């Protein structure tokens, strides 16, 4: 997807809040915006629509 592995790591290595869809750090345990604790890892696969 990205041209460089460093860029891909920076873009895809995130957690997403299930409530407000905010991007958070990988080591986060709660959302930085709303405080929700249900975070998922950002999907790595490319979806074509």
UniProtKB/Swiss-Prot annotation:
Keywords from the UniProt entry: Ribonucleoprotein, Ribosomal protein
UniProt KW Flavoprotein keyword: no
A Pfam family recorded for this sequence: Ribosomal_L40e
Signal peptide (UniProt feature, chain positions): none
InterPro entries: Ribosomal_eL40_arc, Ribosomal_eL40_dom, Ribosomal_eL40_sf, Ribosomal_zn-bd
Transmembrane domains' residue ranges: none
Source domain of life: Archaea
Single GO MF descriptor: structural constituent of ribosome
Chain coiled-coil ranges: none
GO biological process, one term: translation
Any Gene Ontology CC annotation: ribosome
Family: Belongs to the eukaryotic ribosomal protein eL40 family.
Identification of the protein by name: Large ribosomal subunit protein eL40
Gene of this entry: rpl40e
């Amino acid at each position: 997807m990205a041209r460089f592995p460093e860029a891909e790591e920076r873009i895809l290595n995130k957690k997403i809040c299930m409530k407000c869809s905010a991007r958070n750090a990988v080591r986060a345990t709660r959302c930085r915006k709303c405080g929700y604790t249900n975070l998922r890892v950002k999907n790595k696969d490319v979806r074509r629509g």
